[in-house]
């Protein structure tokens, strides 16, 4: 298995760790995914009030969330990128990334844990909270906020 795709209130859950070089999961339209993944690269996408709860061990992890969706991650990655919009949420306080780049807009909220370098860009009433001893590059506009947990 290299990908999971759930839509229209579907639910996918697994008790075993899924191993792949590249892994992708996509949830939309109130769907739910609960999974554990070990991969070189992992792509996580959620939209339209869907939920993803994943344990991820990866070299790189990309996250996209929109339209009131919620992604919860635990595990680790050397590099993580996250783009969130439209009241979506990323809860990744238990997901440790060495390098992290986070962009939020339109009331989206992100919580991340970064150990080396963080680039945070928050706009339009969105927020980014971070933990970890990392160097930061922060941009805020139109009521966006960035702060340490």
Residue ranges: model-predicted function:
Residues 1-149:
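Extended, compositionally simple hydrophobic/Ser/Thr-rich segments
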